[in-house]
Amino acid sequence: MVDSKLTIADRSFNSRLIMGTGGAGNLAVLEEALIASGTELTTVAIRRVDAEGGTGLLDLLNRLGITPLPNTAGCRGAAEAVLTAQLAREALNTNWIKLEVIADERTLLPDAVELVRAAEQLVDDGFVVLPYTNDDPVLARRLEDAGCAAVMPLGSPIGTGLGITNPHNIEMIVAGAGVPVVLDAGIGTASDAALAMELGCDAVLLATAVTRAGDPAAMAAAMSAAVTAGYLARRAGRIPKRFWAQASSPPR
């Protein structure tokens, strides 16, 4: 049987669903969703942890046995992102960082120039860097060349729920990548997560689609099932698309 574990850098995870924590109504709701998702890796906005003390969220993740993945959400330049990552390493005792460098607050799209600059500095400083990036195969390759442990292209802008608006680009990123590809941002429902895996992504990272769903725990369970289904379908190999019909049973 094919090993279904997700491996990034020197760590392996049984679940290919990575969860975010933003948007949850409260810790009780978040806990139910995290348990239902089966996730083993969950992002934590280090700026929010600093502002709110963070003990409740971090204690929750520790109790559930979930690895926290600090991110640099809200950073607008390489210098700010690097400093935030260094603070996260000191606070959480981890050299893993989800790197986000945002161009503006309206689109929340990555600033490609500052993103690469920050990635290069963090890799040189010994970080395991997982960058949130545009759905640009050239930029993804540039980040891999910089030493990033994975690339995390968006499906569509953060929080939009628009799904994967450019599946061909995601396929090109997958085809050219020598590191894991994690679909990050834009997931709206379970079919989006399944499609990401069918396109060849190694994992899916999502938050809003679960935390702001009508029933977060139920949606988390649906996302987990969708990621598994998409992964299995990709491994199984879909039939080729045809222009004309073809009978499944031969004529007598």
UniProtKB/Swiss-Prot annotation:
Signal peptide (from-to): none
An example Gene Ontology CC term for this record: cytoplasm
Pathway assigned to this chain's UniProt record: Cofactor biosynthesis; thiamine diphosphate biosynthesis
One GO term (biological process): thiamine diphosphate biosynthetic process
Principal EC category: transferase
Catalytic activities: [ThiS sulfur-carrier protein]-C-terminal-Gly-aminoethanethioate + 2-iminoacetate + 1-deoxy-D-xylulose 5-phosphate = [ThiS sulfur-carrier protein]-C-terminal Gly-Gly + 2-[(2R,5Z)-2-carboxy-4-methylthiazol-5(2H)-ylidene]ethyl phosphate + 2 H2O + H(+)
Xref: InterPro entries: Aldolase_TIM, Thiazole_synthase_ThiG, ThiG
Gene3D superfamilies, A to Z: Aldolase class I
Keyword Metal-binding attached: no
UniProt subcellular location: Cytoplasm
Subunit structure: Homotetramer. Forms heterodimers with either ThiH or ThiS.
Record function comment: Catalyzes the rearrangement of 1-deoxy-D-xylulose 5-phosphate (DXP) to produce the thiazole phosphate moiety of thiamine. Sulfur is provided by the thiocarboxylate moiety of the carrier protein ThiS. In vitro, sulfur can be provided by H(2)S.
Protein's name in the database: Thiazole synthase
